[in-house]
Regions:
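Short linear motifs at protein or domain termini
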Residues: 1-26
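C-terminal regulatory/effector modules of DNA-binding transcriptional regulators
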Residues: 96-105
Length: 105
């Protein structure tokens, strides 16, 4: 994958996420909001722990669950599927970023 392709994936994902968050805020109900808060709480509990290689997978799972919860209220199955595809395309590079940021603490 070229650098340009990577930048395109991240740009598409950022724009998709922004649109989905806007839709989720407009369409999400109390249960959606409660789920976002619960996932944020779980992520923050892990962020309070010391960063280590073994925590990387758990941190990534909770981080992904938090972001998925945020957009879940958008109400569009197909937009969520497109978002998931972009998320998967960026996964390899996300792990490199995690090792450089989360584990470098």
């Amino acid at each position: 994958m070229s650098e340009q392709e990577l930048l395109d994936i991240f740009d598409a994902r950022a724009n998709m996420e922004a649109m989905l968050v806007s839709l989720a805020i407009a369409r999400g109900g109390d249960e959606w909001e409660a789920d976002v808060l619960a996932k944020a709480h779980l992520l923050s509990k892990l962020e309070a722990c010391d960063a280590s290689e073994k925590m990387l997978d758990e941190w990534d799972l909770r981080h992904q669950a938090f972001h998925t919860a945020i957009v879940a209220g958008c109400g569009s199955y197909y937009l969520l599927q497109m978002r998931e595809r972009l998320f998967d395309l960026a996964a390899r590079y996300r792990f490199i970023w995690l090792r450089r940021t989360v584990l470098s603490v």
